[in-house]
């Protein structure tokens, strides 16, 4: 029995040692060498190119068209005209397919939330926060003081069930994605459930998570992400993370920008597809990069747990379950998703990462299925 255990241990250790991680240059392999039918893969790439998202290239126009109906809506952060469809397919760590300009920096909208979740994971791993702690024990400026908000935990903010009520950087919680057909007074008077009792996708509350983490780290979150994640995985120097024109916070006597968790009001992370792919590969490798653990396995497991009120959502990563299930694909797929068809898709069962920019969002499941089905 002991002899068998040693063989198994050596086998797993050898497998771990043979995993490929890109250096400054990312090695490309032929699809055939990785067990992929090149004709099927090419067909999938052609599908992505021919199903580009219809959002206007001038994303400022697209954002206003999509969200301008919201009460008091205003673009408060930077925007950028987008590029054409592009992306990469990673198999066994190697690039086996790509299309378009994968070095072009673009807005990535709510894929930013998956990066923000990772910053929360860094705080968790450093024992700066405990998931079930109440925010009132960390933030004392009034945002969590009343009876309702005082019950909110980090867990609630991370799975978007906080039901936080208030105003942040000039926008009220009720003004973000309100139900259609209601008057302004009806929107304001919507009843809130107790924290943890309902899922509501809400960028004001996501930005509250960012603000709260800024208060925990007492330094800019882009610097935290850069030092702990992006530099170790070899990301380029071109990515940026923005907040709003009015989201400056005085931290220890210094003005620091509280960054946003998406591009709903402008801002968020601007990044190229190759850096996205490195980030996705880190998660495919369960938080380890070239032998160095950057994120705990505990945190990696937490982000993939379906939330109590939405089985398709974990800690700011989407899960292939519930209403978001892609038919015929493994349930353990998880992904970051952003407005306009921005995706980082992690497929553990096939040792794959897919990054796709500006894909028609209604076609993403079909696109992923085509890639998975290209295995010989």
Which positions does each model-derived feature cover?
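Active-site helix/loop module of the DD-peptidase/beta-lactamase fold
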Residues: 125-164, 217-264
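Active-site Gly/Thr loop motif
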Residues: 247-263, 267, 305-353
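Structured C-terminal helix/loop/strand segments within mature extracytoplasmic catalytic/sensor domains
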Residues: 336-376
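Active-site-proximal loop and beta-strand segments within enzyme catalytic domains
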Residues: 23-29, 49, 53-77, 107-108, ...
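Catalytic-site signature segments of enzymes, centered on catalytic residues
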Residues: 95-100, 167-244, 267
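Active-site SXXK
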Residues: 37, 93, 107-132, 157, ...
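N-terminal leader/targeting segments and the immediately adjacent pre-domain N-terminus
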Residues: 14-101, 126-129, 215, 374-376
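Active-site-proximal alpha-helical segments within enzyme catalytic domains
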Residues: 114, 205-212, 267-288, 342-358
């Amino acid at each position: 029995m002991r002899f068998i255990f040693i063989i198994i241990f050596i086998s797993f250790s050898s497998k771990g040692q043979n995993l490929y991680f890109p250096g400054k240059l990312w090695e490309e392999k032929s699809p055939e060498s990785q067990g992929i039918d090149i004709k099927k893969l090419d067909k999938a790439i052609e599908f992505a190119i021919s199903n580009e998202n219809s959002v206007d290239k001038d994303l400022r126009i697209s954002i206003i068209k999509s969200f301008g109906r919201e009460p008091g809506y205003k673009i408060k952060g930077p925007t950028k005209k987008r590029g054409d469809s592009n992306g990469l397919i990673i198999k066994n760590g190697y690039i086996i397919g790509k299309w378009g300009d994968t070095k072009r920096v673009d807005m990535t909208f709510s894929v930013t939330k998956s990066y923000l979740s990772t910053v929360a994971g860094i705080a968790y791993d450093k024992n700066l926060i405990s998931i079930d702690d109440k925010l009132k024990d960390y933030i004392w400026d009034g945002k969590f003081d009343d009876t309702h908000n005082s019950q909110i935990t980090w867990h609630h903010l991370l799975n978007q069930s906080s039901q936080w009520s208030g105003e942040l950087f000039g926008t009220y919680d009720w003004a973000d994605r309100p139900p259609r057909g209601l008057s302004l007074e009806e929107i304001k008077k919507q009843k809130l459930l107790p924290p943890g009792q309902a899922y509501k996708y809400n960028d004001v509350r996501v930005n509250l998570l960012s603000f709260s983490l800024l208060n925990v780290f007492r330094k800019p979150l882009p610097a935290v992400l850069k030092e702990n994640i992006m530099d170790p995985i070899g990301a380029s120097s071109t990515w940026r993370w923005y907040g709003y024109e009015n989201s400056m916070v005085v931290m220890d006597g210094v003005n620091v920008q509280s960054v946003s968790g998406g591009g709903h009001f402008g801002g968020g992370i601007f990044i190229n597809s190759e850096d996205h792919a490195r980030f996705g590969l880190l998660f495919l490798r369960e938080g380890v990069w070239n032998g160095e653990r950057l994120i705990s396995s505990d945190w990696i497991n937490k982000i993939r747990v379906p939330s109590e009120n939405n089985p398709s959502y974990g800690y700011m990563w989407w899960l292939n379950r519930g209403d978001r299930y892609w038919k015929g694909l493994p349930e353990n797929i998880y992904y970051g998703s952003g407005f306009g068809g921005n995706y980082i898709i992690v497929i553990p069962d096939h040792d794959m990462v897919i990054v796709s920019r500006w894909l028609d969002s209604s076609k993403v499941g079909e696109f992923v299925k085509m890639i998975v089905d290209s295995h010989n």
